[in-house]
Amino acid sequence: MADVYELFLTCPKGLESLLLEEAQGLGLDEARAQVSAVRGQGSLEVAYRLCLWSRLANRVLLVLARFPVENAESMYMAVHAVNWEDHLDAGGTLAVEFSGKGSGIDNTHFGALKVKDAIVDNLRERSGRRPSVDKVNPDVRVHLHLDRGQATLSLDLSGHSLHQRGYRLQQGAAPLKENLAAAVLIRAGWPKIAAEGGALADPMCGVGTFLVEAALMAADIAPNLKRERWGFSSWLGHVPALWRKLHEEAQQRAAAGLARPPLWIRGYEADPRLIQPACNNIERAGVADWVKIYQGELATFEPRPDKGQTGLVICNPPYGERLGDEASLLYLYQNLGERLRQSCIGWSAGVFTGAPELGKRMGIRSHKQYAFWNGALACKLLMIQVEPRQFVTGERGERNDEGLARAPSEPARLSEGGQMFANRLQKNLRQLGKWARRDKIECYRLYDADMPEYALAVDIYGDWVHVQEYAAPKSIDPAKAQARLFDALAAIPQTLGVAQERVVVKRRERQAGKKQYERQSSEGKFLEVGEGDVRLLVNLTDYLDTGLFLDHRPMRLRIQKEAAGKRFLNLFCYTATATVHAARGGARSTTSVDLSKTYLDWARRNLSLNGFSDKQRLVHGDVMEWLREDDGQYELIFIDPPTFSNSKRMEGVFDVQRDHVELLDLAMARLAPGGVLYFSNNFRKFELDESVQARYAVEEITGETLDPDFARNPKIHRAWRITVR
C-alpha cells in the first residue's frame, strides 16, 4: 500500500471553494477544486480525518488508477490489471458505481457491469473464488468515472454519503441536506460568531437541520462521529488501530465541547407536526442541552437570549410550487423583514432562498449574496446586517373608507411601477367605492388590466381581495412578469387596507379540456357575501372562479325583479346564484340544471342559506339531453353557457358558437306563452346566428347588463332578450 494516496472529494455544486478550504485544514496537500469536487493528496490518516470531520463533502474517494479508455474491452483490461487482492477478500461483497460516458460506453449499467466482471474475473483467476454483489452494504464500493476517454477508478471510503449524519431520521417536506446546511452556516459566519459566544435563532426551523449543524460546529463535534459503518470498514487496506486513534480523539474533543456552557441555539416552527420530529433529531445528534425548539408563528418571532447577546438569525423560507403561492410567499418575506427590523437589531441574518427576488421585499438591504445549488434549484444566501441604516421602507399606504378591512399592513417599499399601480387602485376605489356603497354592493371588480403591464383582475369580496393574474404572452420575459406581479401584490394590502392573508392570488389562462374544472386548492373555505337582499357563498381559493360571476350582477337583479309568480329555468346554472335571486323575487318554482355535482351541492347551500329548499329543483345532467326530454313550461329562462364544456358524463363536447342555435331552439320550445328567455355568454368572438334572429324576437341588452365596475371591459359578456314573435 502507498503511503500517500490521491484523494477525490465530491460535494454539491457551489460548495467547492468551501470544501477546498476545509480539506486543506484537515491535511489534504496539493488540493485544487473542480466542478462539484476537490482533489489532492494525503496519507491514510488524512483520508480518515476527511471522512470523520468533513462537514461539506458527499464522498471521499481513494483513487486506485487513472487510464485511457478506447472501448469497453480496454476498460475491462485496465480494471482487471489492478491487484484486487490488496483491497477485497475473494469471498467478500462488492458494489460498483459507474458515471460518465464515451468510448462506446453510453449506458452506465453496462459500464458498471464491465467493471464488476473485471474485478470478479481477477479474483477468481487468482484464488479460485469470486465475490458476490451487495448494492446496499458491500465490503468494498468501487467507483469508475469516465470523462472524454479518461477513466478514474476509485474506492469509496465513505460508504453512504457523508451528508447522512444519522440523526435526521424524520424530516419535513423540503429539507436541506446536512452538508448544504453546514455550508450555509459557514458562509453566514457562524463559526466565528459561535467562537465569540454568540446566539443562533431559526424562525422557520422545520426539523432542525440548521440548529443541529450549528450545535455540532459550536461544540466541536465531528459530524460523522456516530456513524458505525464506513466504506473502508471491510477494505483490506484499512488500519483499525489508526482509525480507533482518530475516533477516540474526536470523542474526546466532543466531550470537551459539550462540557462547556452551551450556546443559546433556538428554533421556532409554526407546524405542530414537526416539533416532535425536530426534538427527536436533536436528541439523536446528542445536542439536546444546546438546542431548544418551540412552536411559534413567524409573526411572534422575537429571539431573546439569556445573556442579551446577539448573533445569527438563519432560515430557509419555503418556496412555492402551487399556483397562487406568490402572494403568501411575498407576505412571508415582508413579515420576516418586519420581525428582523423590530426584534433583531444588531443581529446578523442569513436568508437561504430559492426565490432571491423576494429578498427585496424584506425591507432590509443585503450586504452580501452567495450562490448555492439545492439540488437542481439555484439558490442564494442573502446576508443582512440588521441595522437601521440598512432598512428600506416606504410610506404607509393611504387608508380609505371604502368598507374594506382595517387590518394594519406593514408598509412595503414600492417600486416606481408598483406605486403607479397603487395610484390606479386608489383612483378606481374613489370612483367605484361611492357607487358600491350607494347600491350596497359588497363584491365588485376594482381593477381589470387597466395598465397593460399589470395584467391583473382585482376583485373585492367584502374584506377579501381576489387577484387573478392573466397569463403573460410568450413574448414577455417570465421574470419581468413575475416581478410586476410581486409589485402589485406588495401594493394591494397597503393601498386597500386589507390584511395580507386576505389577498388570494390565481393565474387565469386559456382553459382547455378538463383543465377548466381543475381544483386550484382543497381548502374548502366558503365566505358569505351579500348581493342585494340575498346572501351567497363564494370560495376564493379552491377553483379558478369563485362561484359568483361578478359581471352578471345586473342580470341576476333583473331576474329577481321579473320572477314573481313565474316558473324559472336556469340552464348551466353553475352555483345557482341567479336561482337564488329568482326565488327571492317570488318565483312560483325554480329548476336549475348543471352537469357538475360539485356546483349543484354549492347551489343547494346557496338556496338553503337564503331559506329556500323544498320547491327549488336541482337537476344533475347534460343540459342538451335534459332539454330534449323535458316537457315543462317556464315563463322565465336564463341561459349562460360556458364557451365549451366536456365531461365523461356527456357525449361529445359543447361548443357555444357551434351549438347555440340548437340550444336556443330547445329552450324556446320550453318557453311558456308570454315568457322571456335571457341568453348570455362570455365568448369574445361570439356571433349570434342569423337564423335565431329570423325565428324569434331578439334584442341585444349587453349595455343594460354592465355595471360601472365592468364598463371598462364591455366585451366581458354579451346578452340578449329573446321572446316568441
UniProtKB/Swiss-Prot annotation:
Domain THUMP: 46-157
Pfam families: Methyltrans_SAM, RlmL_1st, THUMP, UPF0020
Keyword Zinc included in the entry's annotation: no
EC number: 2.1.1.173, 2.1.1.264
Entry GO CC: cytoplasm
Catalytic function, reaction form: guanosine(2445) in 23S rRNA + S-adenosyl-L-methionine = N(2)-methylguanosine(2445) in 23S rRNA + S-adenosyl-L-homocysteine + H(+); guanosine(2069) in 23S rRNA + S-adenosyl-L-methionine = N(2)-methylguanosine(2069) in 23S rRNA + S-adenosyl-L-homocysteine + H(+)
Annotated InterPro entries: 23SrRNA_methyltr_KL, DNA_methylase_N6_adenine_CS, RlmKL-like_Mtase, RlmL_1st, SAM-dep_methyl-trfase, SAM-dependent_MTases_sf, THUMP_dom
Listed CDD domains: AdoMet_MTases, THUMP_AdoMetMT
Its biological purpose: Specifically methylates the guanine in position 2445 (m2G2445) and the guanine in position 2069 (m7G2069) of 23S rRNA.
PANTHER family: RIBOSOMAL RNA LARGE SUBUNIT METHYLTRANSFERASE K/L (PTHR47313), RIBOSOMAL RNA LARGE SUBUNIT METHYLTRANSFERASE K_L (PTHR47313:SF1)
Protein name: Ribosomal RNA large subunit methyltransferase K/L
Gene that produces this protein: rlmL
